[in-house]
Amino acid sequence: MASEAVHAPSPPVAVPTVCVTGAAGFIGSWLVMRLLERGYNVHATVRDPENKKKVKHLLELPKADTNLTLWKADLTVEGSFDEAIQGCQGVFHVATPMDFESKDPENEVIKPTVRGMLSIIESCAKANTVKRLVFTSSAGTLDVQEQQKLFYDQTSWSDLDFIYAKKMTGWMYFASKILAEKAAMEEAKKKNIDFISIIPPLVVGPFITPTFPPSLITALSLITGNEAHYCIIKQGQYVHLDDLCEAHIFLYEHPKADGRFICSSHHAIIYDVAKMVREKWPEYYVPTEFKGIDKDLPVVSFSSKKLTDMGFQFKYTLEDMYKGAIDTCRQKQLLPFSTRSAEDNGHNREAIAISAQNYASGKENAPVANHTEMLSNVEV
């Protein structure tokens, strides 16, 4: 009688481990959630893991108790990412300093961003396990130029000389992202680390962070009456937060991914977005006229062809983006359910402007004269 073959048990499949910087922020936290759902072990870096108020939304994620660890790290501290990156196969670098009111932008924003990027690459090299680094870049690396174009792709670069000469709002952020991305491309090549940069436009959608995300201050300015942000969306490009995070993972996992990728699914001028919001959410007063903005503006498009040609598919519409953002803001009491009075009857009236400060504090019904709260030391 032939003896029955006995098979040794299969060795356990190693669970991949990745590091996410800026994990407590708008993009970082959603990316962590999606990675955990896929079974990744995630090393999430934050500035202060002991600040329960700022990390609670991460600790409450499904699988967080088994697959998530928090690590203290700071872009301004050399080598502070070493421990978090040790043992990781991949790194998603989402964190970035954003202080638009800095008195010394060169030393407080630009240099820390570039040094932080290079420090992370050095940490990857020390770990000797990291095969791929995915960097969340910015549309500010593409289209900040004196002569605006109607079409941009991954070969486009903003004009640094123009940025330094004009010093427009947020100029130090644009400059820091450009310099960091270019420096990273060179350094990663020297260290034999695959480097991918993902360039998102305005990111809109639901969120799990406790406070109001900076990009939604811009996207929802049509509702809040924050006129200073209208110029940003007069010829806007958009992507849903979930599509963006799925693209991060898609490119990390795709063996042939390399270089820069734009991740933008929609483009529209401000009048078309305002019309959509008015029709879908009539309870909000949304302007029909925008002073100084031509109704016949052409759209400016960002091409995601390189990304979609690799097989990535966008899932969400522009309406989906706004619905996710508005629903979440309402649930978190960061946005009122209406900006019209009972006597308004749907006719145009002066908007109730709501400042970023009121959003963050939850004072959603406090009327404020057109007030712009600059972004300061936030995590994207």
From Swiss-Prot:
Biological or metabolic pathway of the protein: Pigment biosynthesis; anthocyanin biosynthesis
Gene3D superfamilies recorded: NAD(P)-binding Rossmann-like Domain
InterPro entries per record: Epimerase_deHydtase, NAD(P)-bd_dom_sf, NAD(P)_dehydrat-like
Leading EC class: oxidoreductase
Enzyme Commission no: 1.1.1.219, 1.1.1.234
GO molecular function: dihydrokaempferol 4-reductase activity; flavanone 4-reductase activity
Alphabetical UniProt keywords: Flavonoid biosynthesis, NADP, Oxidoreductase
One GO-annotated biological process of the protein: anthocyanin-containing compound biosynthetic process
Positions with a binding annotation for NADP(+): 54, 173
Pfam families, per database record: Epimerase
Catalysed reaction, written as an equation: a (2R,3S,4S)-leucoanthocyanidin + NADP(+) = a (2R,3R)-dihydroflavonol + NADPH + H(+); (2S)-flavan-4-ol + NADP(+) = (2S)-flavanone + NADPH + H(+)
Top-level division of the source organism's lineage: Eukaryota
Family designation: Belongs to the NAD(P)-dependent epimerase/dehydratase family. Dihydroflavonol-4-reductase subfamily.
Function: Bifunctional enzyme involved in flavonoid metabolism.
Protein name: Dihydroflavonol 4-reductase
Gene (name only): DFRA
